[in-house]
């Protein structure tokens, strides 16, 4: 078996999808988990204004609405979290995403003071962190806030991770990857766009250039520039299509070099 086939089998990506069916599958997946865990009453997503969190949040809102109707239980809620670091440059996109999602509840928590406080404490101990490490601190602080709210709201922290991120290891260990449940894990980027389009998401949101925007020294740097390969190539690879050798080598190197992120924790 080639490495490509092994990865595809492991991540469970389909070569083609029907958006309506995938939307139903994702909602049913979330519904089933909540029904089987009666103490959980809310779904929680950090909404950044990007494709992944917009889709995940919309699916969660649909799930909460469906459960309220089917179970005649108004306690099922979707909670959207806005977790900016200072002033977010694409705040308009975030607000447009919120209007599209129509969440039951919204909490706004600015993480900048917490991140800088942690950095200051480390500096006092003689540890000066790099801009790159600070970026990971932001991702972990956001996850910490989500779990704090989940604990107070009988909530489940829902991940926005997908197959194109997973294969490249383009996530923060114990940050955005540290979630309870991931409904879109088997989708690639173009499939995410298809689902958003099917749900009548504003075009500028589902066509938005993906970027993590974690590093202060490289603001608005898009994912593809960091990875050195396009999402189109990654998606085609995950759909078992032939791609150029250079892109294939980059993708497979990224996968192998980030195995430690997908196998946690390391045990004897």
From Swiss-Prot:
Keyword ATP-binding: yes
Residues the record lists as binding deamido-NAD(+): 140, 173, 180, 260-261
CDD domains, alphabetized: NAD_synthase (cd00553)
Superkingdom of origin organism: Bacteria
Pathway: Cofactor biosynthesis; NAD(+) biosynthesis; NAD(+) from deamido-NAD(+) (ammonia route): step 1/1
GO molecular function: ATP binding; glutaminase activity; metal ion binding; NAD+ synthase (glutamine-hydrolyzing) activity; NAD+ synthase activity
Binding annotation for Mg(2+): 52, 165
UniProt binding sites for ATP: 46-53, 160, 189
Keywords: ATP-binding, Ligase, Magnesium, Metal-binding, NAD, Nucleotide-binding
Catalytic activity reported: deamido-NAD(+) + NH4(+) + ATP = AMP + diphosphate + NAD(+) + H(+)
Coiled coil, from the record: none
Pfam family, one: NAD_synthase
GO cellular component, as recorded: cytoplasm
KW Ligase (keyword) present: yes
GO biological process: NAD biosynthetic process
Disulfide bridge map: none
Family as reported in the entry's similarity comment: Belongs to the NAD synthetase family.
Assembly: Homodimer.
Summary of the function given for this chain in its UniProt record: Catalyzes the ATP-dependent amidation of deamido-NAD to form NAD. Uses ammonia as a nitrogen source.
Protein name in the entry: NH(3)-dependent NAD(+) synthetase
Species for this entry: Buchnera aphidicola subsp. Acyrthosiphon pisum (strain APS)
